[in-house]
C-alpha cells in the first residue's frame, strides 16, 4: 500500500546499489474502522471467538467472546539494514548475491536454459493474498502479499555482517560452490567490494572443520563483556554509517 524506500541502498561492508522502484498504493479501504493520515494507517479489528466450558451436569456451555484491537501502521517505509552472522558462509553469500541479482534484474545461462532473478520461495515477495471479491462478478481479487501494507522491499535492504573468515564475498561465494558460474561472473565485481567484519570465535560452538578459515577474529576465545560491547559498537556504527531508521 506504500512505496519502497527511495534512498540509495547498498552494503555496509563495501558495495552499493539502487533502491527498488517506488510503487503507488494498490488499494484503499473505505470503512469507518480505518483511518488514513499522511503518516499512518489506523484500523480497528474485532476478533471473535467462542469459549467453551463444561458445567456440573456435563453439558458444554459456549460463550461468544469479542476482543477489540487497535492497529497502527506507519506509511513511511523505513530504511532497513540486516547484519548477518556468517556473512561469508553459504547462506550469507547466496542471499547477498540474490539481492544483487534481483536489484539489477539479472539473467544468466544455465545448463537448463536462461534463468532470471526472482524472489520465488519468499512468503512476502512470492505469494498473493485474497483482498475480497469483485462487486460485479463475484470473482476473487488477489493481490501480491507485499502490497497488503507498507513493507520494506528486499532490494532496498542494506547488507552487512560478521564472519570468522576474512575473504571478500566474491572469494567466499567461490568457496561456497552454490551459485551458477554465469551468475557469479555477473555479481563478482560488487561482491569483491564486500568484506565481513571480524567475528567472535568460540571453538566449542563452531564445527571443528571451520578452524582453518578463522582468520578474521575479535580477540578472545571466551564470552566476555568486551565481545558484547564490540558487537554493539559494530551495530551502532552500521546504523549510523548507512543512515538507517
Enumerate the language-model features and the residues they cover.
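Metallocofactor- and cofactor-centric catalytic cores in central/energy metabolism, strongly enriched
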Residues: 2-245
Amino acid at each position: 500500500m506504500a512505496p519502497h524506500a527511495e534512498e540509495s541502498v547498498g552494503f555496509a561492508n563495501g558495495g552499493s546499489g539502487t533502491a527498488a522502484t517506488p510503487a503507488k498504493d494498490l488499494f484503499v479501504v473505505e470503512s469507518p474502522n480505518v483511518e488514513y493520515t499522511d503518516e499512518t494507517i489506523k484500523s480497528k479489528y474485532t476478533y471473535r471467538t467462542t469459549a467453551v466450558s463444561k458445567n456440573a451436569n456435563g453439558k458444554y456451555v459456549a460463550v461468544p467472546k469479542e476482543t477489540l484491537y487497535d492497529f497502527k501502521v506507519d506509511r513511511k517505509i523505513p530504511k532497513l539494514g540486516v547484519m548477518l552472522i556468517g556473512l561469508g558462509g553459504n547462506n550469507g553469500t547466496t542471499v547477498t548475491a540474490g539481492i544483487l541479482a534481483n536489484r539489477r534484474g539479472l539473467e544468466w545461462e544455465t545448463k537448463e536454459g536462461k534463468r532470471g532473478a526472482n524472489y520465488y520461495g519468499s512468503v512476502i515477495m512470492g505469494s498473493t493474498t485474497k483482498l475480497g471479491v469483485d462487486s460485479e462478478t463475484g470473482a476473487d481479487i488477489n493481490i501480491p502479499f507485499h502490497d497488503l501494507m507498507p513493507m520494506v522491499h528486499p532490494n532496498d535492504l542494506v547488507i552487512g555482517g560478521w564472519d570468522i573468515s576474512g575473504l571478500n564475498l566474491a572469494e567466499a561465494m567461490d568457496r561456497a560452490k552454490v551459485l551458477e558460474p554465469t551468475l557469479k561472473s555477473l555479481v563478482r565485481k560488487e561482491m569483491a567490494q564486500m568484506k565481513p567484519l571480524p567475528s567472535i570465535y568460540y571453538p566449542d560452538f563452531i564445527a571443528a572443520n571451520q578452524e582453518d578459515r578463522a582468520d578474521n577474529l575479535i580477540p578472545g576465545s571466551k564470552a566476555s563483556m568486551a565481545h558484547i560491547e564490540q558487537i554493539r559498537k559494530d551495530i551502532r556504527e552500521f546504523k549510523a554509517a548507512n543512515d538507517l531508521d
